[in-house]
Curated annotation (Swiss-Prot):
ATP binds at residues 34-41. The keyword Cell inner membrane applies. It comes from Mesorhizobium japonicum (strain LMG 29417 / CECT 9101 / MAFF 303099). Keywords: ATP-binding, Cell inner membrane, Cell membrane, Membrane, Nucleotide-binding, Translocase, Transport. SMART domains: AAA. It is found in: Cell inner membrane. This is Hemin import ATP-binding protein HmuV. Its EC number is 7.6.2.-. It holds the Pfam family ABC_tran.
Length: 263
């Protein structure tokens, strides 16, 4: 489990995240949503150990501030918003970087085949020999996800859940691949791991998230299930946009259409 209590982050003397309480449980997808500049990525970087913070964050019972990077890498893998490479790596070489720590959790002898298996999962079968720089933005994003999957291939290792931290994992993808990637996240959670994902698409969030954490001006504005959180009033307050939230009869699933704008 990931637990964060009263977490704040200051950058260049300015408070970006203030007093946030958060928890991510194994077996669920936790989505962080909010407008641009609300502190989502900054908070995720604190959760992943990249940014300094005040307050307390625990990862599987361990105080995050006392964990070494190699130790954190066993428990969680991070997909950033964007990754730039300056050298002509092949796709397979990029994906293999996820195996550097040697704790993928794959069965003995399977590590050598993991890059190809991970690429197949993100619908890039046959791309291993291509150069990374030759790919489109969406293809590069999926290569990076394959790398991350190799790092924590087994969602549970030594009896402890592992976590995927995904910062806008579908931002560059067409609708088919958005669904593929979100199904990968859901499957990872179903098999005992946990997922923390920053998302902008409220409909995908409603479809896949077990709980939503809504950030606004560096603080949490709401927390709960999609049914509890997504409402006309909250969207107007947080996103400064008057939209009507509909509900699908099957599963009581909320949805939001831009055509419902009531300006």
């Amino acid at each position: 489990m990931i637990e964060a209590r009263d977490v704040s982050v200051d950058i260049a003397g300015k408070r970006i995240v203030g007093g946030v309480d958060f928890d991510a449980r194994p077996g669920e997808v936790a989505a962080i949503v909010g407008p641009n500049g609300s502190g989502k990525t900054t908070f995720l970087k604190a959760l992943s150990g990249e940014f300094a913070y005040t307050g307390r964050i625990a990862l599987n019972g361990h105080n995050l501030s006392s964990m070494r990077p190699a130790e954190m890498a066993v428990h969680r893998a991070v997909l950033p918003q964007a990754t730039t490479l300056s050298f002509p790596f092949t796709v397979r070489e990029v994906v293999k970087l996820g195996l550097v720590g040697g704790r993928s959790g794959a069965l003995p002898g399977e590590d050598a085949r993991l890059p190809e298996r991970a690429l197949a999962r993100v619908d890039l079968d046959g791309f291993a020999g291509r150069f990374y720089q030759e790919l489109s933005g969406g293809e590069q994003q999926r290569v990076q996800l394959a790398r991350v999957l190799c790092q924590v291939w087994a969602p549970v290792l030594d009896g402890k859940p592992r976590y995927l931290f995904l910062d806008e994992p579908v931002s560059s993808l067409d609708i088919k691949h958005q669904l593929i990637i979100m199904n990968i996240a859901r499957d990872f959670a179903k098999r005992g791991g946990g997922v923390v994902a920053i998302l902008h698409d409220l409909n995908l969030t409603s479809m896949y998230a077990d709980r939503i954490f809504v950030m606004h001006r560096g603080r949490l504005a709401a927390t709960g299930s999609p049914q509890d959180v997504l409402s006309d009033d909250l969207i107007e307050k947080v996103f400064d946009c008057r939209l009507r939230v509909g509900v699908l009869p099957a599963g009581n699933m909320p949805f939001v259409l831009p055509q419902s704008s009531v300006y």
